């Protein structure tokens, strides 16, 4: 018999997370490491678990995540986005709750491109009057 699993893709900045939900006891594994070991910060661990806590499904699923690109904050955000999408696939009744919390919305903020004549996106070279 095939195992029941749900899938969601999450994106944030340059990070892309592929999230798989499998019935289990609530383990969260990111790139074959425990979530706290991978991200190294309690705040990012909390960000990842937000959709589970909001929907009271913490002990119902094991979460398996493959995430690439970006930095730790972007990866945590991408994981949260993918997890929310996977939860909606598992139970469509959770959609309004997750939508209201903003977990199903792709955060459109991206790094601004560097412009020629400037050092960074907006940082101009030092100006000297004399």
From Swiss-Prot:
Residue ranges with Basic residues bias: 111-130
Chain residue ranges for the region called Disordered: 108-130
GO CC annotation terms, alphabetical: cytosolic small ribosomal subunit
GO molecular function: RNA binding; structural constituent of ribosome
Keyword Ribosomal protein: yes
GO BP term (any one): translation
Key words of the record: Ribonucleoprotein, Ribosomal protein
UniProt entry tagged with the keyword Ribonucleoprotein: yes
Protein family membership: Belongs to the universal ribosomal protein uS9 family.
UniProt name for this protein: Small ribosomal subunit protein uS9
